[in-house]
Each structure stands twice: as C-alpha cells, then as structure tokens.
C-alpha cells in the first residue's frame, strides 16, 4: 500500500473536494496487460535495432499499424535513433511501452512522436527510465529555436502518460491538444535554459497532471485556451520558467482550473497569467499551496504583457479566483513584488480572493503589491461590486509577514543546463512537493513487490500482476474506480515482471483503487 503523506504546511487551507475540478474519470479504459494479451508488437520484429543508428520511424509505424486496434507496441531497452517522425493516428485500445531511449537524429520540424485521433491509450515506461532525447542543443547552438517538438497528443481520449522522461527538445516537450479524460504523472522533463522550450502545454478537457518535474526556462505546466476541468498538482518547477496560463488572445475560454502543491525554485515566476488585449473569459480558478524560492515573480496576472502583440478586444475577463496558502521568498521584492494583478480596464477582474499569502524578499528589506482594475479581497484588491476600472495602485511592505518561511527541496538545482551543450537524461524524482508523496509509486520501483500477485499470460512468458482492488465506500467528491475489475500488472517485456502498488488518493479524498495494466482508471465526482 502506497500512502500519501503531507506536511502540515501543505495541509493548510485545502479546498473542499468539489474544487478539485475534474469532471469525470481519467485514464485508459482497459489495462496494458489486457492490451498486451490481445497482441504485442515488438519493434525489433519490424526492423528496429537498438544500435542508435537504424531509424526507428518506420518500424514504430509498422508495429503500430498491427496493434492499433488493440494491442501493445513495445520498444525494449536500448538506444534507438529516430530520423523520420512517427505519426500514429486512429488507434483504439492500444498502449505504447517505451523502455529504451529514443535519440533524435532527424532534422525536420513538426513532432517526433505525434499521437492523434486515439482512445483508450497509454504511453509509459515499465522501468521508469524510458526517454526521448531531443539533442536540442544541436539546434540551439546555432540560435535555431524552431526545431521539432518531442511528443504531441491531439484528439486523444481516455489516456495516460506516465513514468517517462523527455529531455532537451529542440522546441516544446509535451503538448496535449484537444484531448480529454487524461492523466499525466511521474515524469521528468529537462530542457535548455531558454524560452520557447515549453515543458507541458495543455489545452484540453478533464485532465489530471500530477507529480511532474520540469527544468527549462519557459513554461513549466501551462494551461492554454480552450481548457476546462484541469487539475494540476504536485509540480516541481526546478529552475524553470514557472507555471502559467496563456498567452491568451481572442475568444479565450478557460474554466474550472486548479493548481495546488506547486513548488517553484529559481524560476521566472510561480504563476503568470498573460494576455494583452483579447476577449473571452477565465473563471473558477484555484491556485493553492504554492511554495517558491528565488523566483523573479511570484503571483503575476498581467493583462498588458509586453512580450505579445496587442490583440483585438477589450481584454480577457478574469473572475472567481481563489489564491490560497502561498509561502516562501522572491528574489527581489523591491524590483518585482510578490503580488501583481494588472487587469484590463475594459474588462476588470472580479471575485478575486487572496488568503493566507505570506512571502518575503531575499534581497533588500521591502516589497510591493500592485493591482489595477481588480476587485475582491486581499492586499491591493479593491472591494465593491461596481467593477469600474481604476489605475494601478501600489502598496509597500517594509517588514516580513509572519509565517512566510517554507521548506526547500533536496534536489533543487544549483545551476542551469545552458542551451548549447548536451543535457544529461535525469531520473524521475520520488518527491515533487515538500512533504507530499506521489500518488503512484514509480513503476520501476515496484518490480520487487511481492504481495497479492498472480501470473497473467504474456505470450510464452508470465507477467506478475496485482489482483483486484482495495475500496472504500463511494463518497461525493471522492475518486472512484470505473469500468474494470481487472488484475493489475505492468508489462515489463517478454521475460520480466512487475507488480503494481495502490496509489494514494488526493489529500482528504477516499478512492477505490482497482489497479491494472500499469495504470488505473480514476473516477472523480463532485
């Protein structure tokens, strides 16, 4: 049993369960073990070679073609070259298990692996060490920032992506485009120290992203438009750009978003919501349990963001924001204060609430808070309900607030990785927020477990699986299992075996935990 524990700090001010924002179940509908039992397509049988030279593109596409209607595509341990990109379209009830490392050798734009129009899908590494190495520095040293993305999912439903590593993309690392009912977790993303190298970008519906570490100098985990019912938690922005929303332009449509348990170290910001003109709305947002150290900005809602051109419209309207339990320090509060809420004069923000927010400057002895056309409570936010525009107001603090002290993480980086030399492949951490245990143990750490197992046929060998489920009575606002009582088992390759442990629910939430196939389908009600 894998038990979730949270520090006293991270328990402060947790929102009601209904605020978790997911609208329904997330994850694949059938297990990876069931998919593998239907059919297994090993890329080595289609011409691939783990020699870091032979192009994996065609063998991967051929293996997918044979397993796309039900099966598991398997990339065994080893080093593979990818010269021609893989566009994998139209899959149903399939999985992609990458236990090897895929090195970019091609130079085209686009997406190295592009998965689209698929359902009931899972991408994972059973060893938690499978990776894509984009070798982006080969582009970046020539000041070229428009190379390929590593991994993009488009129009994919009921899916999971986990226990996988993305390194040094020439461009963005992971994009979730118009997807639904998905879960992303237990990942490490490490990019160059430069803009335009986004970690995770999501514009989708009903997505749970948790237990992810990002190193780069642009987006950590960022929500773009349109997006609804996104839950982002246990995020480690370790020398990154930081989390955010945007850039937001015309017809913005974002609602029911929660970020919680976000730790940000030496980054551009803890949270940046950026727009410049535009139209539409961002509503029903919770930003809670944020810890930051050494960041340039902390809370930055900027409707006049100068790094984007002005869009047509009176501005994006922000409403019903709860910002709760922020602790830590910013780099220099006199230069960049911890609270900056600049709303459009043509579309003032309203119902903006800041609670239990205590941060202090690392340099100097003062910091400022500034608001413009923003209504609610806390710091410089104005009260009232007429929501008339007003010019920016600034207040200055010259003494530290009580309770601002916050822990650091042992894995906080002491330097960046630059952008012109090769970046090493990291291991996935086992902690992403101080005092919080990941909801699911790493698959690679579970292979030695021995309780409650049974063998499941896998070709001529056996895969060890966790049988059945643990359960609690269903409660409103709890996570529930859905659509399966199958045995749980990760696919470790033709001769290996693994056991899946039971993951812990989000803090304060009971959840039945039928586990299967390296993953489980979560139901969330509120």
From Swiss-Prot:
Catalytic residue list = 218, 293
A matching Pfam family: Glyco_hydro_28
User: InterPro entries from the entry?
Assistant: Glyco_hydro_28, Pectin_lyas_fold, Pectin_lyase_fold/virulence
Q: Which reaction does it catalyse?
A: Endohydrolysis of alpha-D-GalA-(1->2)-alpha-L-Rha glycosidic bond in the rhamnogalacturonan I backbone with initial inversion of anomeric configuration releasing oligosaccharides with beta-D-GalA at the reducing end
Give EC number(s), comma-separated: 3.2.1.171
Please give the Gene3D superfamilies that the UniProt record associates with this protein. Answer: Single-stranded right-handed beta-helix, Pectin lyase-like
The UniProt entry's sequence similarity note says:
Belongs to the glycosyl hydrolase 28 family.
| UniProt keywords, alphabetically | Carbohydrate metabolism, Cell wall biogenesis/degradation, Disulfide bond, Glycoprotein, Glycosidase, Hydrolase, Polysaccharide degradation, Secreted, Signal
Query: Any idea which GO molecular function terms this record carries?
Result: polygalacturonase activity; rhamnogalacturonan alpha-L-rhamnopyranosyl-(1->4)-alpha-D-galactopyranosyluronide lyase activity
Task: From the record, give the cysteines joined by S-S bonds.
Answer: 41-67, 220-237, 343-349, 371-380
Gene Ontology biological process terms from the UniProt entry: cell wall organization; pectin catabolic process
Per the UniProt entry, the glycosylated residues are 144, 238, 253, 320
Gene Ontology terms: cellular component: extracellular region
Q: Where in the cell is it found?
A: Secreted
What name does this protein carry? Probable rhamnogalacturonase B
Q: What class of enzyme is it?
A: hydrolase
The organism is: Aspergillus terreus (strain NIH 2624 / FGSC A1156)
The record describes the protein's role as: Pectinolytic enzymes consist of four classes of enzymes: pectine lyase, polygalacturonase, pectin methylesterase and rhamnogalacturonase. Hydrolyzes alpha-D-galacturonopyranosyl-(1,2)-alpha-L-rhamnopyranosyl linkages in the backbone of the hairy regions of pectins.
May I ask which residue range the UniProt record assigns to the signal sequence?
Answer: 1-20
